[in-house]
Amino acid sequence: MITGIQITKAANDDLLNSFWLLDSEQGEARCIVAKAGYAEDEVVAVSKLGDIEYREVPVEVKPEVRVEGGQHLNVNVLRRETLEDAVKHPEKYPQLTIRVSGYAVRFNSLTPEQQRDVIARTFTESL
């Protein structure tokens, strides 16, 4: 459990009135702010704080959003043959716009390699 504290009495003057987060499960303390001697976000063993007195301060914990290998979907509504024809005859498709990585881009402005990649990724036989 994480507890927020303000140190009110300590043998080490650098700790006086400093704010910390105590992790009782790990036995660690994370410095939030101190006048001197400790850096912001520095983590030390609680025992390193020595003999201290403190008052608890409320800590608001916001849920952390974690994105781990998320998915991204671009939807292009057209036929494979249209893109293949645009590769062969770009002059026929000057306004052909597709979605690539969340951006709208003119298909003809892509390199031939990028065009082939879009076609390969856009049209699959199965998922």
From Swiss-Prot:
Gene3D superfamilies: 3.20.70.20
Source organism per UniProt: Shigella flexneri serotype 5b (strain 8401)
Pfam family, one: Gly_radical
Primary gene name: grcA
Ranges where the Glycine radical domain occurs: 5-127
A molecular-function term among this protein's GO annotations: formate C-acetyltransferase activity
N6-acetyllysine: residues carrying this PTM: 48, 88, 92
Alphabetized UniProt keyword annotations: Acetylation, Organic radical
UniProt modified residues of type Glycine radical: 102
Record carries keyword Ligase: no
Protein name: Autonomous glycyl radical cofactor
Family matches, as InterPro entries: Auton_GlycylRad_Cofactor (IPR050244), Form_AcTrfase_GR_CS (IPR019777), Gly_radical (IPR001150), Glycyl_radical_cofactor_GrcA (IPR011140)
One GO cellular component, as annotated: cytosol
Function: Acts as a radical domain for damaged PFL and possibly other radical proteins.
